[in-house]
Amino acid sequence: MKIALIAHDRMKEQIVQLAMAYESILAKHDLYATGTTGSRIMEATSLSLTRFLSGPLGGDQQIGAMIARNEMDLIIFLRDPLTSQPHEPDIIALLRLCDVHKIPFATNLGSAEIMLKALELGQLDWREVVREENEA
């Protein structure tokens, strides 16, 4: 599965802690992240991942391009709900694309943990079927 890890500035420590706690699960998948988030995760874990630009500089859109091609299977985007984000339209576009392509989108620590536990149990394997249907 291809998983994107994204976090707003005030949430970066939480996503690093999440990656550390679920490293054994995440290590079995192809990981992608926006710039700073990816750097922080790689510094704290032994996970390898593909890093895109920082979110406000286009990293969200790079991940969005993969979503538009139905090349992502899970998005974990720990958002800061209390701070206005200048790239909010990009975030809304990601959410919309995930809805179009039936890609799970976790926006907080609770939903991210549930998704990762479901991933471990094989409960997101249906994504492979959805991907194949869209390729046909």
From Swiss-Prot:
Coiled-coil boundaries: none
Protein family according to the UniProt entry: Belongs to the methylglyoxal synthase family.
GO MF annotations, alphabetized: methylglyoxal synthase activity
Gene designation: mgsA
Record CDD domains: MGS (cd01422)
GO aspect biological process, one term: methylglyoxal biosynthetic process
The entry's keywords: Lyase
Role summary: Catalyzes the formation of methylglyoxal from dihydroxyacetone phosphate.
Active site: 60
Domain MGS-like: 1-136
Transmembrane segments: none
InterPro entries (UniProt xref): Methylgl_synth (IPR004363), Methylglyoxal_synth_AS (IPR018148), MGS-like_dom (IPR011607), MGS-like_dom_sf (IPR036914)
UniProt-listed Enzyme Commission number(s): 4.2.3.3
Protein name: Methylglyoxal synthase
Listed HAMAP family: Methylglyoxal_synth
Catalyzed reaction equations: dihydroxyacetone phosphate = methylglyoxal + phosphate
Organism taxonomic ancestry: Bacteria, Bacillati, Bacillota, Bacilli, Bacillales
Glycoprotein is among the record's keywords: no
Binding locations of substrate: 8, 12, 34-37, 54-55, 87
One Pfam family cited in the UniProt record for this chain: MGS
Any one GO CC term of the record: cytosol
